[in-house]
């Protein structure tokens, strides 16, 4: 059997970015043949990605990129908060954000097929899964390229906001921070999605019915609740987070600034996290051992 040297392991690691021990195992299995070892590693890393694909990814990061009037916000997910701080994962996220800005893919599938550092985004993602050992996914992104000014705000790496505006940049940055804190769903009350209004109206109707009030009063209660909700979730109507004596709309008017649109991403929003039941896990392991 050929001797496996440190330089051989280092060379294979440089080619595949795989963990050191995995490289040594592959070289041993390939009897020192570097090309064969590389092929073995590619297959192994791919198998790891396949096994990881079904695992829930509710942690992760939001990354942003702005170049002039082009801006991107992208959410990438992983399984644990620990990996969300991994340098390789963060570097991949930043590169993906920049690639979206430059190449303008239509969706995540198109993005995955684009080339990044000489290989496809999908191949890079798969290799990273093999290296880190967790499922990693690109969940969603938005790209602004309408010619307007842009600012972004990241609260750590878990909340990201992109704001398109005309006017004062400092005021726009304040709005981005406000959006991260108050989480509006639209610019104005008129733009609140119909399904959200219907859901709120249904809740209000149920409460009104339970109150036992006469129909006319109950109807007014429902309408009042809906109008209050619309003000609470529309950006322009919200009390400004840095000065609640004025609304965001009033603050923008005083700053001679117009907000044309915004996007808010919160990591894992809407993804059901897996709740581990330790007792059930132990019971399952005991049962499996007894069968064996």
Swiss-Prot record:
Classification via CDD domains: UBA_EF-Ts
Alphabetized GO MF terms: translation elongation factor activity
Stretches the record annotates as Involved in Mg(2+) ion dislocation from EF-Tu: 80-83
Signal peptide: none
Cited InterPro entries: EF-Ts_dimer_sf, Transl_elong_EFTs/EF1B, Transl_elong_EFTs/EF1B_dimer, Transl_elong_Ts_CS, UBA-like_sf
Pfam families per UniProt: EF_TS
Keywords noted in UniProt: Cytoplasm, Elongation factor, Protein biosynthesis
Gene Ontology CC annotation, any one: cytoplasm
Domain of life of the native organism: Bacteria
Entry keyword annotation includes Ion transport: no
Locations listed in the record: Cytoplasm
Keyword Translocase set for record: no
Gene3D superfamilies documented for this protein: 1.10.286.20, DNA helicase RuvA subunit, C-terminal domain, Elongation factor Ts, dimerisation domain
Family of the protein in this entry: Belongs to the EF-Ts family.
NCBIfam families from the UniProt entry: tsf
Protein name (Swiss-Prot/TrEMBL): Elongation factor Ts
Organism per entry: Cupriavidus pinatubonensis (strain JMP 134 / LMG 1197) (Cupriavidus necator (strain JMP 134))
Gene: tsf
């Amino acid at each position: 059997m050929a001797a496996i040297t440190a330089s051989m392991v280092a060379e294979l690691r440089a080619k595949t970015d795989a963990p050191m021990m995995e490289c040594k195992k592959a070289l041993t299995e390939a009897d020192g043949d570097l090309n064969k070892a590389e092929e073995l590693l590619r297959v192994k890393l791919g198998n790891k990605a396949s096994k990881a694909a079904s695992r829930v990814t509710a942690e992760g990061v939001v990354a942003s990129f702005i170049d002039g009037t082009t801006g991107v916000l992208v959410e990438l997910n992983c399984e644990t908060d620990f990996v969300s701080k991994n340098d390789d994962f963060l570097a991949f996220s930043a590169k993906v954000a920049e690639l979206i800005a430059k190449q303008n893919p239509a969706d995540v599938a198109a993005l995955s097929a684009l080339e990044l550092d000489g290989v496809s985004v999908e191949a890079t993602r798969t290799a990273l899964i093999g290296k880190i050992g967790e499922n990693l996914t690109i969940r969603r992104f938005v790209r602004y390229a309408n010619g307007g000014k842009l600012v972004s705000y990241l609260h750590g790496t878990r909340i990201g906001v992109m704001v398109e505006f005309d006017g004062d940049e400092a005021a726009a940055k304040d709005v981005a921070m406000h959006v991260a804190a108050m989480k509006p769903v639209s610019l104005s009350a008129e733009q609140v999605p119909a399904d959200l209004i219907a859901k709120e109206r249904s809740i209000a109707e149920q409460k009104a019915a339970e109150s036992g009030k006469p129909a006319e009063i109950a109807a007014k209660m429902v309408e009042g609740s809906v109008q209050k909700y619309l003000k609470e979730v529309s950006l322009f109507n919200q009390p400004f987070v840095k000065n609640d004596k004025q609304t965001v709309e009033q603050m923008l008017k005083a700053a001679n600034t117009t907000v044309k649109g915004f996007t808010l991403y919160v990591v894992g929003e809407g993804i059901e996290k897996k709740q581990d039941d330790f007792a059930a896990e132990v019971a399952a392991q005991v049962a499996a051992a007894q069968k064996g």
